Amino acid sequence: MNLPTSAIRIPLCLALLAGIAAFAVSSASAATVVALGASNTYGKGVARNQAFPAQLEAILRAKGLNVRVVNAGINGDTTESMLQRMDRVVPNGTSAVVLQPGGNDGRKGRPDRTAEIQSRLSARGIAVIMLPNNAFRGLPHQADGMHLTPEGYHMIAESLASQVAAAIGR
């Protein structure tokens, strides 16, 4: 039996469109979390998938949450620089920001702009989860004594998971 090619093409096109629509809905409903910070956010000394933002996303997804965690950490960053780039790296629609100011302000003699970052994010309706420097005490560090090992970053991600899940309302 020879079917007209339209009998095959139309269902195939409809199936393709349904798949695209399902992907778009799935992607659109994913909550966005931005990890904004310095080298311990970036994951200095470890692979990108071992930094805490990537591990946090994996933990949340394993719990069934549709979430995307963006790593906006920069080695050596100051809170002044974070404030300057914040609107660019924290897009509208972001559900939460994990803010890790780091210790570079003090080392570089720069003003601490953490409160201003928090205020501006809150004014945009974005939940702010602070990750203070003392959160890294007692965790496994690399030989430099400042940056965590993959295990240490995993411990940070685990400690943040419930706060992030609550902040994004999932």
What do these predicted regions represent?
Residues A54-N66, I74-R170:
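Alpha-helical cap/lid subdomain in secreted, periplasmic
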Residues N2-A15:
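Bacterial N-terminal signal peptides that target proteins for export
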